[in-house]
């Protein structure tokens, strides 16, 4: 069963920040390529959502998946959708994902 993939506001903000950083460092083409790959990886969870590593130690039901050693996608699988809670750039700590939001 395919699930709908939804990016949270926080995940959308992460995508924008990653794009801006790469754009400043390497230009528009590279930023488009990297962000495109990240979003493709997110939307690929619609068919096979139980990928990555379960991280109940951070939040019950949270899963994380690395993307090409460039980023980590943090997400939760629900009955009919996959919610992307964060897309963290290389070196960012997934443990702080929910702390920073005060959750």
What are these regions (language model features)?
Residues 31, 53-55, 96:
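Short, hydrophobic secondary-structure boundary micro-motifs
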Residues 7, 38-39, 45, 88:
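Generic leucine side-chain signal with a strong bias for well-ordered alpha-helical environments
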Residues 40-67:
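A short, surface-exposed loop/turn module that caps and links secondary-structure elements
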Residues 1-35:
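Arg/Lys-rich, positively charged N-terminal/basic patches that mediate binding to nucleic acids
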Residues 71-103:
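Enriched for short, Lys/Arg-rich terminal
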Residues 6, 66, 83:
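Conserved beta-strand segments that form the floor/walls of ligand-binding pockets within enzyme
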